[in-house]
Amino acid sequence: MIETDMLYAHVKLKDWLKPTAEKLLRRIAQGEFGVVATSREVLHELYYVSMAEGVELDSYISRLAALTSIPNLSFRETTAEIDLLAATLMKQFRLSSIFDAYYAATALNAVADHTIISTDEVFDKVTGIRRIDPRNM
């Protein structure tokens, strides 16, 4: 599973993670990892981050179109179980971001290997999740 940091870096014009994101998403598009999951919540987080950065709505829509058209990237829907698990993970592991909690819950509930590709070390403290830093792939 891949979370927002790589996807957001991919759609931004400039980002310190953009070279890593471009390489990783090219590999995903080519099918090197099979189908890679992500949470549909990344689209919501992308909205809030984009608006906070002053991105125009048309640009946000273009970003969504770019992400949702990546071959071999599958957006996982949230479920009531994922919603409840996300809130529980926030409490149990003191996660401050609801989005990180959703990604962790999705990885635990809807991704067979419970792996998250992310630079965010917050996932290291969630029992059952294996984080892979994309800069090391």
Roles of regions detected by a PLM:
Residues 3, 37-39, 95-97, 120, ...:
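Histidine- and aromatic-rich ligand-binding microenvironments
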Residues 10, 31, 49-53, 70-74, ...:
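Alpha-helix C-capping/helix-to-loop hinge sites
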Residues 73-115:
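Active-site neighborhoods of divalent-metal-dependent phosphate/nucleic-acid chemistry enzymes
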Residues 1-38, 50-62, 137:
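Short, well-structured N-terminal submotif of metal-dependent ribonuclease cores
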Residues 104-137:
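Acidic, PIN/NYN-like endoribonuclease modules and their adjacent C-terminal/linker elements
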Residues 34, 73, 129:
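Short, conserved active-site loop motifs that form the nucleotide-linked donor/cofactor pocket
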Residues 7, 43, 123-124:
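A generic structural signal for short hydrophobic patches within well-formed alpha-helices
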